[in-house]
Amino acid sequence: MAIGIVGRKRGMTRVFTEEGGSIPVTVVEADPNRVTQVKTEESDGYRAVQVTAGRRKPQRVRKPEAGHFARAGVEAGRGVWEFRLDKGQRASDEEMPETGGSIDVGGFEAGQKVDVTGTTKGRGFAGTVRRHNFRAQRNTHGNSKSHRVPGSIGQCQSPGRVFKGKKMAGQMGNRRATIQNLEVVRVDSERNLLLIRGAVPGAVGSDLIVRPASKA
């Protein structure tokens, strides 16, 4: 049973089918994740599996983290991630990994639907036309210096403020995003690779979280 796995984006390529079709895929390299903690309803109030991935220099590990990794008997990784088991995702005790064990790509299979979470590429400060797909105003016919301005951002005295969440200019990208219901095209257990149909958030080399689809 696939609970989830943390990997890194290695780029995009294509896979050809026997019929000659071309499928664009993202290559995710997911080395075996080391289990640092298994949470249960009795001790933590919910069921989850906490993992780490990658390597980190010992001098870069803080003492609380070093103690946590040492108790689990695993090497310190570049981060800690948690895969929570919801009520609809019931796993028996035999299927749950043990602390100090590992999770690899073998839990996934071709054709399976997954959700991929990553950090989008940062685009810097952007206006509303680029950031929110606002329509630009006229170039002529009385429009002076207001071609790409957003227009009105609210009312007058009532309510006398700008509502929270108003779409305005600001930082674009560099935020957490999830693409749902992507198909696993191929699983390469020997090279720890997942080939996922389509594009996923993030730059090459960034961390990705791959989970079984929640809405499949």
From Swiss-Prot:
Keyword Plastid: no
Ranges where the record places region Disordered: 89-108, 139-158
Domain of life: Bacteria
InterPro entries: Ribosomal_uL3, Ribosomal_uL3_bac/org-type, Ribosomal_uL3_CS, Transl_B-barrel_sf
Any one of the GO CC terms: cytosolic large ribosomal subunit
Membrane-traversing stretches: none
Modified residues (N5-methylglutamine): 157
Pfam families: Ribosomal_L3
GO biological process: translation
Post-translational modification: Methylated by PrmB.
Gene Ontology MF terms in the entry: rRNA binding; structural constituent of ribosome
This protein's record includes keyword RNA-binding: yes
Key words, A-Z: Methylation, Ribonucleoprotein, Ribosomal protein, RNA-binding, rRNA-binding
Functional summary from the UniProt entry: One of the primary rRNA binding proteins, it binds directly near the 3'-end of the 23S rRNA, where it nucleates assembly of the 50S subunit.
Family label: Belongs to the universal ribosomal protein uL3 family.
Complex formation: Part of the 50S ribosomal subunit. Forms a cluster with proteins L14 and L19.
Name of the protein: Large ribosomal subunit protein uL3
Annotated organism of origin: Halorhodospira halophila (strain DSM 244 / SL1) (Ectothiorhodospira halophila (strain DSM 244 / SL1))
